[in-house]
Curated annotation (Swiss-Prot):
Known function: DNA-dependent RNA polymerase catalyzes the transcription of DNA into RNA using the four ribonucleoside triphosphates as substrates. Component of RNA polymerase II which synthesizes mRNA precursors and many functional non-coding RNAs. Pol II is the central component of the basal RNA polymerase II transcription machinery. It is composed of mobile elements that move relative to each other.
Main location: nucleus
Miscellaneous note of the record: Pol IV and V functions are not impaired in nrpb9a mutants and Pol II functions are complemented by NRPB9B.
Gene behind this protein: NRPB9A
Species, as recorded: Arabidopsis thaliana (Mouse-ear cress)
Protein name: DNA-directed RNA polymerases II, IV and V subunit 9A
Alphabetical keyword list: DNA-directed RNA polymerase, Metal-binding, Nucleus, Transcription, Zinc, Zinc-finger
Gene Ontology BP, a term: DNA-templated transcription
Subcellular location: Nucleus, Nucleolus
Binding site for Zn(2+) 2: C76, C79, C103, C108
Domain of life: Eukaryota
């Protein structure tokens, strides 16, 4: 998918346009009325990449989520607090689900997995 398409007739930018009768995507020139059928139905793709610090913030916020299950059967290795929320998710580069724990001590937020 190229980022921009240009008119073959006048070299102006082609804009996405729907042909409602044929239900196809076209690229149309607003200057000379040239139109061409789009070779791909994807007009724009927005990829969001989160930094490590953003992912860490998401994990520390889960300790205050009232919808997540809590347990007092674990002890935080960092602060010795006896309450943690837990959830299952896939760990990066691993297959299957991993059980994650996040310490409920607001001054700690330590996270670990089993």
């Amino acid at each position: 998918m190229s980022t921009m398409k240009f008119c073959r007739e006048c070299n102006n930018i082609l804009y996405p346009k729907e042909d409602k009768e044929q239900k196809i995507l076209l690229y149309a020139c607003r200057n000379c009325d040239h139109q061409e059928v789009a070779d791909n139905s994807c007009v724009y793709r927005n990829e969001v990449h989160h930094s490590v610090s953003e992912r860490t913030q998401i994990l520390t916020d889960v300790a205050s989520d009232p919808t997540l299950p809590r347990t007092k059967a674990v002890r935080c290795s960092k602060c010795q607090h006896r309450e943690a929320v837990f959830f299952q998710a896939t760990a990066r580069g691993e297959e299957g689900m991993t059980l994650f724990f996040v310490c409920c001590n607001p001054n700690c937020g330590h996270r670990w997995r089993e």
